[in-house]
Amino acid sequence: GLQPTSPPIDVMLMIAAVISAASCMQAAGGLDYMVKLAERLLRKNPSQVTILSPIVTYLFTFVAGTGHVAYSVLPVIAEVATETKIRPERPLGIAVIASQQAITASPISAATVALLGLLAGFDVTLFDILKITIPATIIGVLVGALFSMKVGKELADDPEYRKRLTEGYLDVKKVEIKDIHNKRHAVLSVLIFILATVFIVFFGSFDSLRPAFV
């Protein structure tokens, strides 16, 4: 018998704004540029792919506010791990988990925006939320990455892997990253997006910076 509440228009508009900004960054080649940087980092340190992969996907989601951006780098993670004779499930598993953990720590994710709206009447600021979620998720991801380094047998000791390799079932194809036509625009789009994220944190943390309507 409770009367339905009004729809969360403010939260919906915030989510729409984030999606629009991320779409503009994608159209300008910003996401492709981020994937290029991630690929360069992973290929430069292939033996540390299990540790670096979750850090990369965490940062992707943290910056963009959605875990969907992490999909672009997963093929690179799998390829680097296979070339280094590391079980791909180790970096891939924790990388996907890290991207989802970052949703609760991203200042522009739908989850954080919704939580901020729910706690609006309890004198809780965006900074209050982030100072808990960011350290907690980073520590959890790093601990998970350390445990992932021992998941399953080494590929050299895995009879099923050796069997499939001998029979020619494992054909590792080179992942080709999309070329960036205008690097300047891509870099600029990423910088603008990150700068906007910083402003969001400031506006969400200090009441005096937000507009007040009568």
Predicted feature locations:
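Residue-level signature of transmembrane alpha-helical entry/exit and packing/kink sites
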Residues: D10-V11, P46-T50, I129, T133, ...
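Membrane-embedded alpha-helical segments and adjacent helix-loop junctions characteristic
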Residues: L2-T84
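Alpha-helical transmembrane segments and, especially, the helix-loop junctions at the ends
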Residues: T57-L74, P88-D128, I132, T137-V151
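Long, contiguous bundles of hydrophobic transmembrane helices that form the permeation core
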Residues: K131, P135-V214
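Transmembrane helix-loop junctions in multi-pass membrane proteins
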Residues: Q26-L31, V63-T66, A120-F122, V201-L209
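Small-residue-rich segments of transmembrane alpha-helices in multi-pass membrane proteins
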Residues: S47-I51, A105-S106, A111, E167-V172
